[in-house]
Amino acid sequence: MKSYMAKTNEVERKWFIVDAEGKTLGRLSSEIAKILTGKNKPEYTPHVDTGDFVIVVNAEKVVLTGKKLDQESYTYHTGHPGGLKQISFRRMLAEKPELLTYHAVKGMIPKTRLGRQMLKKLKVYAGENHDHEAQQPQALEL
């Protein structure tokens, strides 16, 4: 029996909506990464994007355990001399809560062209409202 290899034009993508309220950031992000990569499907193929679209709402109400709010931070460089910047999780959660969830999922996706394509299917919103009612997303309980 031959192994099945999915083709790009045969993949059927669904839309899922996830409520992040009260969920732990890392556990939520790993489940979202599985859906984006398509590893939850039986027709998963490593070189084809078989994943589904994921909408995350209430990103501002995500939970971090322990002292991570104060101790952990994201580091980035502006590209200019002396441009190394750090932003703590507490500040990021207060200013741009959707970026905290986005970066957590981004770290769990492959760092390739295919990974960047998978990450485009992630839509994160700080509050309850989102712009994707026309896609009729299915509620997903993680």
Swiss-Prot record:
User: Looking at the UniProt record for this protein, which Gene Ontology cellular component terms does it annotate, in alphabetical order?
Assistant: cytosolic large ribosomal subunit
Q: What is one process in the GO biological process aspect for this record?
A: negative regulation of translation
PROSITE patterns registered for this protein in UniProt? RIBOSOMAL_L13
Single Gene Ontology MF annotation: mRNA binding
Q: Pfam families given for it? A: Ribosomal_L13
Among InterPro entries, the record links this protein to:
Ribosomal_uL13, Ribosomal_uL13_bac-type, Ribosomal_uL13_CS, Ribosomal_uL13_sf
Gene3D superfamilies per the record? Ribosomal protein L13
Which terms are listed as keywords in the entry? Answer: Ribonucleoprotein, Ribosomal protein
Explain the purpose of this protein. Answer: This protein is one of the early assembly proteins of the 50S ribosomal subunit, although it is not seen to bind rRNA by itself. It is important during the early stages of 50S assembly.
Subunit structure, per the record?
Answer: Part of the 50S ribosomal subunit.
Question: In which family does this protein belong, per the annotation?
Answer: Belongs to the universal ribosomal protein uL13 family.
Q: Which PANTHER family match?
A: LARGE RIBOSOMAL SUBUNIT PROTEIN UL13M, RIBOSOMAL PROTEIN L13
Record protein name field: Large ribosomal subunit protein uL13
Q: Which organism is it from?
A: Alkaliphilus metalliredigens (strain QYMF)
Ranked from the top, the taxonomy reads: Bacteria, Bacillati, Bacillota, Clostridia, Peptostreptococcales
**Gene name on record?**
rplM
